[in-house]
């Protein structure tokens, strides 16, 4: 496994883990998360793919410029990465906000260069509309109730001034059974994204509505969610229902089915994704 750097046209540089041979698979972690958190999955999937796990701008080992913290810019970063590495066709896997980056990429650049998609636990639309029914709120995975909730979460990110406060912030994304001794590593990786930049990106992503993009996806797709996630399992089933022949896998709450099921039940997660990619 090696770490490579990709120089972007706006002057920033992205860092990525690279390993394996075969068709390229680009992995895009979620908000404040890093490629290092995916090492176990990277190693597993490298048996059948040339895996490139990105640190988005500001995240992990990537450069941290003071500009560009919008989902649209992250989609451009993904596009430039594919172009600069001269990858003719790629599989894409995103987690959380990483899915939104993929949806923005599809919206801007289409699907012709994408082989297969793995979409891991992101809501189609996190911010509600007043006229939506309770079923629609569940189907679209509305995480926020109002703009005040966005402000509160952004303030929570800004309040993460050290490792202890960051541990408290990330704890809510896991099931109660998740080993306490593993949280410091997750928090350390999370904290690599400067908090003022993290809050800026969080605010931009909060109001995205990706339903019309999802409904146009024609790539072979696996959707993964968790019963104990911050996003409803109904929202993951809705995504799968909108994409022809998409597969869906919902992890039960007692089997690590949190927003981070790929950490809590890595063996099952890796096995399911490998099975999908092989077929």
Model-predicted regions and their roles:
Residues 94, 98, 102:
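Gly/Ala-rich beta-loop-alpha elbow adjacent to hydrolase catalytic centers
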Residues 216-257:
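Conserved loop-alpha-helix segment in the C-terminal half of the alpha/beta-hydrolase fold
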Residues 12-67, 71:
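Conserved HGGG/HGGXW glycine-rich cap/lid loop of the alpha/beta-hydrolase fold
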Residues 103-108, 113-157:
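Flexible "cap/lid" loop of the alpha/beta hydrolase fold
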Residues 128-129, 133-134, 152-215:
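Conserved alpha/beta-hydrolase catalytic His-Asp/Glu region
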Residues 254-266, 270:
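Catalytic histidine-centered segment of alpha/beta-hydrolase-like enzymes
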Residues 73-90:
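Conserved acidic catalytic loop of the alpha/beta-hydrolase fold
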Residues 1-25, 46-49, 87-88, 115, ...:
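Alpha/beta-hydrolase fold catalytic core
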């Amino acid at each position: 496994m090696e770490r490579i750097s990709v120089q972007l046209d706006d002057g920033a540089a992205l860092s990525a883990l690279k390993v394996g041979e075969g068709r390229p698979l680009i992995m895009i972690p979620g908000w404040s998360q890093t490629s290092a958190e995916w090492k176990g999955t990277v190693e597993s999937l490298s048996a059948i793919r040339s895996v490139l796990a990105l640190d988005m701008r500001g995240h992990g080992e990537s450069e941290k410029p003071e500009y560009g913290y919008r989902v649209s810019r992250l989609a451009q970063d993904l596009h430039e990465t594919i172009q600069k590495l001269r990858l003719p066709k790629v599989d894409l896997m995103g987690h959380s906000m990483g899915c939104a980056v993929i949806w923005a990429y599809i919206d801007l650049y289409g699907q012709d260069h994408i082989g297969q998609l793995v979409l891991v636990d992101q809501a189609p639309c996190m911010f509600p509309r007043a006229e939506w029914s309770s079923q629609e709120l569940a189907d679209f995975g509305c995480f926020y109730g109002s703009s005040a909730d966005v402000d509160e979460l952004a303030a929570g990110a800004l309040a993460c001034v050290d490792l202890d406060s960051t541990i408290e912030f990330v704890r809510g994304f896991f099931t109660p059974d998740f080993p306490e001794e593993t949280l410091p590593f997750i928090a350390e990786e999370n904290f690599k994204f400067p908090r003022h930049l993290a809050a800026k990106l969080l605010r931009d992503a909060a109001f995205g509505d990706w339903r019309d993009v999802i409904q146009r996806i024609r790539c072979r797709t696996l959707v993964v969610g968790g019963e104990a996630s911050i996003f409803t399992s109904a929202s993951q089933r809705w995504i799968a229902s909108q994409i022809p022949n998409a597969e869906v896998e919902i992890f039960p709450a007692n089997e690590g089915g949190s927003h981070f099921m790929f950490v809590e039940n890595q063996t099952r997660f890796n096995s399911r994704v490998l099975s999908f990619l092989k077929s």
